[in-house]
Every structure is written in C-alpha cells, then in structure tokens.
Amino acid sequence: VSTLNDDELAKIRNQEIGFVFQSFHLLARSSALDNVMLPLKYAGCSEDEAIRRSEKVLEKVGLSDRKKHAPSELSGGQQQRVAIARALVNKPSILFADEPTGNLDSKTGNDVMNLFKELNNQGQTIIIITHEDNIASQSNRIITIMDGLIKSDNRN
C-alpha cells in the first residue's frame, strides 16, 4: 500500500475496509437509513441501490423497524448497530472495530459481540481492538500487543 496514491488509498478505505468506532460518529440530524447510506453516496451508488442495500443491512443488524429514527431516538446499542450497518454497507473485506463496546453497558456490549459472532459465522472478517478481557475472550483469536510488540497470539 505504500506505493498507492491518495485516491487509490481512499478507494481501498471506502470499499474494502469497514470501520466501527467507540463513539458512533452518526450524523445527528439524519435518520438511521441516511447514516447507513452515506458511504454508498460517496461511492457513487444510485439512490435506489443505496436505499435497497442500506435497508438490507439494517435488517441484518435488526433495525429495519428503526430506519426512520434519528440517533437521538435510538438507544446506545441501537446507535452502535447503525454504525455497524454503515460499516458493512459497502461489503468490506474486513471490518475494524475499535473499542466497539466501550460506551455500552455490559448487556448491550454482549449483544454487539453476538452480532459480530453472527457476522463472522457468515464469513465476515472482523478485527476488534479492545482493552476489555471479557470482550476479547469472546473472540476466536486473541493477539495481545504491548508497547507496539506482539506479546501473545492465542486461539480460543
């Protein structure tokens, strides 16, 4: 990737990699559907195709009945599922989740982890970055990094 120009790197980021953050980064004045459609708009997808794909992925994360709701009308767990749907809508090869349960209570965090397990069982590659041992222990593989060095690499 070091030889790619900015446009090529942006294309990879937008089409091959999905990102989920601890803070949901949803647009406050947009509906769940519009938030999920955003990456497709940047990718030049038609409005009809963007709606179809966004509705499908919202259904996949269990939020088809909340698609017209603004983030302020959703619980923290629902907002995180909208963020996950947005990360998945471009069908990325890999999903990076940076502290995806950090702002959630333990039950909602477990719900998000169950969703990740389901997605992984369907073939989605997911890398979760977490400081929470109880979250890490739910993964198939745990790589511990300290001071920039790999300290352990274990499969569950």
Write out the residue ranges for each language-model feature.
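H-loop (His-switch) and adjacent beta-strand-loop-beta switch element
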Residues: I142-N154
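ABC family nucleotide-binding domain
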Residues: V1-I145
